[in-house]
Amino acid sequence: GVMPTVATALPVVTVASPLPVLGDLITLIYLFAIARFFFAIAGLDTGSPFTGIGASREAMLGVLVEPILLLGLWVAAQVAGSTHISFITDTVYHWPVARSLPLVLALCACAFATFIEMGKLPFDLAEAEQELQEGPLTEYSGYGFAVLKWGISLKQLVVLQMFVGVFFPWGQMTHFSAGGLLLAVVVAALKLLVGVLVIALFENSMARLRFVETSRITWAGFGFAFLAFVSLLVA
């Protein structure tokens, strides 16, 4: 239920959030954290050593990637003057030229974090088929397995839409109209399609990382987020 809740707050066809009460940036980040927590707990609950290892890796990825996403979005929030996702999206839509550098660096940091959050190569450590065979999902089957796989797929879509909706809001409606709604739906689908194609291109051009190297690579994403923060202070 967490991912559908997050999805209702994301700007998809409009610049404003459809559900403003859930549109606060901090709320959305911690809803993602709750989803990861229960996914890890689902793996630990079976008692299998393979699911336990997969769950611990999932938790470790959360520790590494969530600060990147939070800091990158926080920089965008500071540029917008609000932590509400509607204000952030509207600011990016009108693109303040004087704050271009912090926004571009924040975009790079959030793109890095989005790629990791989607569990694509080389960061699919929790479900590495050659090592753990589905990781936290090893002991699941039937309806339970289907629900968990559906949740993972939905999370990938929601994370990608959050990134695309906030940092590439062009084509989304600022004022409602029937023609604008139709155009916005088409543009939203095209943006998601382009995002999936770019991610697939990156995923198929890289090999899986060794587990111990993950933290070294994620420092690059945090570096982008930190540079965005520094450039915001200097700007």
Please give the residue ranges for each predicted region.
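Transmembrane alpha-helical segments of integral membrane proteins
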Residues: 41-44, 169, 192-208
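Interfacial loop-to-transmembrane junctions
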Residues: 198-225
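Juxtamembrane inter-helical linkers in multi-pass membrane proteins
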Residues: 122-145
